[in-house]
C-alpha cells in the first residue's frame, strides 16, 4: 500500500491522526476549502492541511491511527476519487 509521508499543518479541521485519506490537492486554499465544504455537506468530517514545502493544500476526508482502517477508507473513496491516497503524518 502506497503511503506518502509529509509534514503538514491543519488549516481547517479537528486534527490529524497517523494516517489520513487525501482526496484532493490544490495550490489554492479557496479550492481546497471548496472541496472540504462539499465533503462536509455529504456528511464527512473533512479537513484541510497545508504542506509549506510544496505550497499545496491537502483535502483530507478521513483520518485514522490504524493503517488497515485508513486503507479500507481510501479504497471506498476511490470510487468517487480515483486518485485518493494515504498521508502519513510526519
Give residue spans per PLM region.
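Extracytoplasmic
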Residues: 1-19, 27-90
Amino acid at each position: 500500500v502506497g503511503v506518502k509521508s509529509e509534514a503538514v499543518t491543519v488549516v481547517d479541521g479537528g486534527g490529524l491522526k497517523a494516517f489520513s485519506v487525501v482526496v484532493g490537492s490544490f495550490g489554492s486554499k479557496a479550492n481546497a476549502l471548496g472541496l472540504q465544504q462539499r465533503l462536509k455537506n455529504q456528511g464527512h468530517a473533512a479537513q484541510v492541511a497545508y504542506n509549506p514545502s510544496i505550497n499545496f493544500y491537502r483535502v483530507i476526508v478521513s483520518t485514522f491511527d490504524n493503517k488497515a482502517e485508513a486503507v479500507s477508507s481510501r479504497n471506498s473513496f476511490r470510487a468517487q476519487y480515483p486518485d485518493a491516497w494515504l498521508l502519513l503524518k510526519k
